[in-house]
Structure formats: structure tokens, C-alpha cells
């Protein structure tokens, strides 16, 4: 049995205003069997979105960039994303038909569902890191996310619904 390649995906999301212009940053890191380190950075900015949507988009973009099944460690400063999986919020939402415990529709259900699709070919675990505390990759992802949010060519977040 062949072991899955291991990829670390570091992510961060940002929004100016919440809602406001936003962006995500993502670093994919893979050490190949010869010991060569491969790294790729991804980012994009959106006209009107929220920080939580951008946190989700960072993970989605990283997973969707992978070309074959991998063991993936997602490293994020977003408790929203990490706790949703590690504390099984997502499983509960699915059982309740994408409703919260208080029977409200789950926010960002479109992106949660897209994230679940992106996870399917992979074995994924989620790890939380404290943001803005000198974690090199988290700081880089934050810089990518804020630069994307401040960029000139912002995309439309078609799933964003103002409250």
C-alpha cells in the first residue's frame, strides 16, 4: 500500500469592514521523497465578503489546487474553520439539514459544502495556530490575504448574502 503524499496547507482570510473587501492567502508545502521542498502561494481578493468566508476560501483554494489524493494538514488561525471539524459542528449541521442547534440556517453553507467536496479525495486534519503571534507561515498568509483584499482586481463573492 502506497502512502499518500503529505501536504501542509497554511491559510488566512481577511476582510476590511466585515462585510467589506476581503481576501485569502494560502501556502501549500510539500516535501517530496528526494527531500526537495515544493511551495506554492495562492491568493485572491473579493469586492464584498466577510472574514469567515475568506477563511473558508483559503482552505478551499488550497485543497482544490491539489492534483492527486493527499494527506493534508490544514493549519489556520481561524477557530471558526478548525473547530467546525475538530468539534464536529459540520457533522451536526449535516444531520440537521444545514441548520444550527437553534434551527437557524448555517451561515456560509455554500462554502462549507464546497469545502466538503474539496476534501473528498484527501485525508484532512485541521490544526489551529494563534494568529498575529509570529508564526511565519500564518504571517505570510495574512500578508497575502490583506494584499489581495486591497488589490484592484477584486472578484465577486457570488455566495455572499448581506444580513
Tell what function each PLM region has.
Residues 1-53, 57, 61-70, 85, ...:
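RNase H-like nuclease fold core
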Residues 14-21, 57-140, 144, 149:
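RNase H catalytic domain
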Amino acid at each position: 500500500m502506497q502512502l499518500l503524499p503529505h501536504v501542509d496547507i497554511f491559510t488566512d482570510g481577511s476582510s476590511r469592514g466585515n462585510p467589506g473587501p476581503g481576501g485569502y492567502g494560502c501556502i501549500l508545502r510539500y516535501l517530496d521523497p528526494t527531500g526537495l521542498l515544493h511551495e506554492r502561494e495562492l491568493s485572491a481578493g473579493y469586492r464584498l465578503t466577510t472574514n469567515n468566508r475568506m477563511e473558508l476560501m483559503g482552505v478551499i483554494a488550497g485543497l482544490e489546487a491539489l492534483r492527486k489524493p493527499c494527506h493534508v494538514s490544514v493549519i489556520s488561525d481561524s477557530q471558526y474553520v478548525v473547530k467546525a471539524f475538530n468539534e464536529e459542528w459540520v457533522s451536526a449541521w449535516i444531520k440537521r439539514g444545514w441548520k444550527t442547534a437553534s434551527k437557524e440556517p448555517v451561515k456560509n453553507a455554500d462554502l462549507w459544502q464546497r469545502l466538503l467536496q474539496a476534501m473528498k479525495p484527501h485525508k484532512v486534519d485541521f490544526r489551529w495556530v494563534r494568529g498575529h503571534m509570529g508564526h511565519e507561515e500564518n504571517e505570510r498568509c495574512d500578508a497575502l490575504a490583506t494584499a489581495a483584499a486591497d488589490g484592484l482586481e477584486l472578484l465577486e463573492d457570488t455566495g455572499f448574502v448581506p444580513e
